[in-house]
């Protein structure tokens, strides 16, 4: 595999590790921070779950809108936009830890939406530019492990991390944001073809 395969996979590890925690802990974090509840059977927890559904929709609307920005970018800017999106995603995840107002969470999920677009487009674009056409199908198939493996690792280590962080779902999202920022830093080490 070309070196870019491995370089991008390092970035992917941090990103998908973080995203696993977004999916796993968002409802509980929102319930704790905004509704001050931790009991999943409570009305507040259900309201938090419903609000997370609205925020998830906002996240994807943000992704679609930001797609128009990315579409106008030059190939030489791919690494910049990749890192930019990951920084925004990291800030969005970290902000959930600090926000206690449901409406302010819209800001967090707009940023996470920008991240969502970049982490689902830029890695594949950077990889396909780095590989020859002869083996591209095989490499792209193998590249999917850089999405699955980090989520498996995140799930396994959560059995130790969650108690270590005081069984705090907001703290797990804070950790996810830090992982996303580490991914943004790792983009610097990708040897992109258009540079």
Which residue ranges define each predicted feature?
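Pair of pore-lining "gating" transmembrane helices in MFS-fold secondary transporters
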Residues: 5-22, 110
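C-terminal ends and interior cores of transmembrane alpha-helices
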Residues: 88-100
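Loop-to-transmembrane helix entry
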Residues: 36-60
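A late C-terminal transmembrane helix in Major Facilitator Superfamily
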Residues: 133-165
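Helix-to-loop junctions at the C-terminal end of transmembrane segments
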Residues: 65-78, 162
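Intracellular juxtamembrane helix-capping segments at the cytosolic ends
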Residues: 118-132
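A membrane-interface helix-boundary motif in multi-pass transporters
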Residues: 160-180
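Multi-pass alpha-helical transporter architecture, strongest
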Residues: 174-195
């Amino acid at each position: 595999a070309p070196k870019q395969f491995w370089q991008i996979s390092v970035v992917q590890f941090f990103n998908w590790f973080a995203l696993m925690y977004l999916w796993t802990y968002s409802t509980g974090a929102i319930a704790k921070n905004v509704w001050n509840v931790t009991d999943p059977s409570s009305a507040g927890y259900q309201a938090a779950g419903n609000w997370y559904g609205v925020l998830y929709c906002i996240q994807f609307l943000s992704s679609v809108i930001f797609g128009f920005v990315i579409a106008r970018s030059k190939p030489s800017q791919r690494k910049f936009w990749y890192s930019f999106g990951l920084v925004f995603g990291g800030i969005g995840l970290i902000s959930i830890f600090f926000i206690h107002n449901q409406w302010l969470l819209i800001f967090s999920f707009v940023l996470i939406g920008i991240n969502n677009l970049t982490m689902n487009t830029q890695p594949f674009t950077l990889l396909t530019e780095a590989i020859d056409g002869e083996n591209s199908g095989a490499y792209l198939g193998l590249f999917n492990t850089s999405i699955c493996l980090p989520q498996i690792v995140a799930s396994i280590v959560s059995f130790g991390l969650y108690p270590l962080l005081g069984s705090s779902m907001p703290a797990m999202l804070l950790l996810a944001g830090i992982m996303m920022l580490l991914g943004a830093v790792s983009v610097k080490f990708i040897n992109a073809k258009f540079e």
